[in-house]
Amino acid sequence: MNYLPMMIVFPLIMAIIMNLLHGKEKAVKYITFITAAILIILPFISQYGYYYFGGHGVVNGWVSGIAYLYNPAKQAIIVTLSLIASLVLITGMGEKLKNNMFVTLSLMGFASIAAIVLADDIFNLYVFFEIVSIVQAGLVFLSGTEEAYKAGLRYMIMGNVAAALMLLGIAFLLASTGTLNITDMKHYLLVDNPMIYGGLLLLIVGLAYGAGLPPFHNVKADLYARSKGFISAMLQTYSKFVLVGLMIIILKLFNGLDYFASAHAVLIALGVLAMVFGVVMALLQSDYKKLLAYHAISQGGYVATGLALGTPLGIVAGIFHAINHVIYKSALFLGAYIVSCKRGSNLHKLGGLLPLMPSVAFMVLCAKLAISGIPPFNGFQSKWMLAQAAMQVNMPEIAIIMIIVSIGTFVSMMKAFYLIYLKPVDEETLKEYQNKEVPKLAVFSLFVLTALCIIIGLYPDIVTNYLWDYAKELGVNYYLK
């Protein structure tokens, strides 16, 4: 039996069940733990290859139904997604909020991202793109603050515009090719057709919105900053894998075509702008969660730039960095959540936490070194590959920008670490800290993620070996022609 469809169907079914368990907190917690375990198992027991929903398959050379493609690269992405989702779900069980609604939305988001990553049907991809956009706003609303409601509403308003433009782009491609299946569609994109150019441009608009690239970076950063820390970890994971999923589709359809050269330049520019804007804005922040939110935007720029290069090395580096990023950034957001349980997120009101939580401080420091690209952590491995990919296509200026942004990231992170853990505070503040408990489930999740930062940093091949074959299939050494 092929369990591939269960990666989408199972979380959707569980989301419906959770929605029926309002007020039954104990049942919600038990079922959530079981669901989290199953989410991690499913990617390992599913078979590689194409899966056709509805039993239609291929008819006269055409795919008449919804199709999904599963391969080692997509397995690496979904395993990472499953791990982050499971840890966030477990952490959320220790928080006082509407647990059934939190789990319902989280599972719907998981199913949507899995569908986006697996989709070989562009309209099916769009449907789940819309769902995950609504889910992200809903998760922010759970924070219950006025700022959270405003951030979620702004995101939904912008999403209505971006998603409508993306749907129009899909309509252009359908009108030009006569099919929605991605594998079939790519064979009809060789012709010189203005509608195809328009469709590509509008897909890039949807990509920028979903991933938080300029001009949508401020809206997305506000979404992360106004959520609870563990929910922010989930949101940024969704965004990075939306970016990867949509970029894979764009590369599969257009990479190597002569008219895609301009799109290469646009996508690289968006990635570089996100890197620079993100780190500059992070350096200006006095709120810790806002600082982390802008770093999430900056790191998304690295991913977009690597994938936009379109070469096998660039694609491997981009996907690898996305996987690394969601791991260390989730660790940082969980660290911020633990700190906020003590005394909020205003950096000027924090300090002196090192003696009270030395193990948490150490794990957060590891995650900060990982995001800064310091060896031997995982962030160094993927950033090094990204710089190599830029050099390979004779773009040393991009590699230099990546290094400068990493330096800015390191400065910002060390400043925050000092203000939170090392800055001296008075005795009254220390007593206030001691009266507030540290969420143990969050510490457990932080430990798992920190361990992964170290393990992948020391043994990067355990991830990259899954990526190379698909990257060689998608990649074209366009700039080396």
Curated annotation (Swiss-Prot):
GO (cellular component) term, any one: plasma membrane
Topology of the protein relative to the lipid bilayer: Multi-pass membrane protein
Keywords: Cell membrane, Membrane, Transmembrane, Transmembrane helix
Organism: Methanocaldococcus jannaschii (strain ATCC 43067 / DSM 2661 / JAL-1 / JCM 10045 / NBRC 100440)
Subcellular location: Cell membrane
UniProt key word RNA-binding: no
InterPro entries in UniProt: CPA3_Na-H_Antiporter_D, ND/Mrp_TM
Transmembrane segments: 3-23, 33-53, 75-95, 99-119, 122-142, 155-175, 196-216, 241-261, 264-284, 303-323, 351-371, 400-420, 443-463
Protein name: Uncharacterized protein MJ1309
Main subcellular localisation: membrane
